[in-house]
């Protein structure tokens, strides 16, 4: 069975993990109702996407 010949250093381990960081969700405000929504997605408050009504909402 294969085993490592040398111990992996902290620097090498951290360089390997440099791309594992989490990023924050991109929030924007809806142009129609002003509610916060995720970028490039339908607004859950008013159902609007790029100026067109996509979802039916109970208002």
Swiss-Prot record:
Transmembrane segments: none annotated. The keyword Cell membrane does not apply. One of its GO terms (cellular component) is large ribosomal subunit. Keywords: Ribonucleoprotein, Ribosomal protein. Pfam families: Ribosomal_L32p. GO terms for molecular function: structural constituent of ribosome. Gene3D superfamilies: Single helix bin. InterPro entries: Ribosomal_bL32 (IPR002677), Ribosomal_bL32_bact (IPR044957), Ribosomal_zn-bd (IPR011332). One of its GO terms (biological process) is translation. Belongs to the bacterial ribosomal protein bL32 family. This is Large ribosomal subunit protein bL32. It comes from Fusobacterium nucleatum subsp. nucleatum (strain ATCC 25586 / DSM 15643 / BCRC 10681 / CIP 101130 / JCM 8532 / KCTC 2640 / LMG 13131 / VPI 4355). The lineage of its organism: Bacteria, Fusobacteriati, Fusobacteriota, Fusobacteriia, Fusobacteriales.
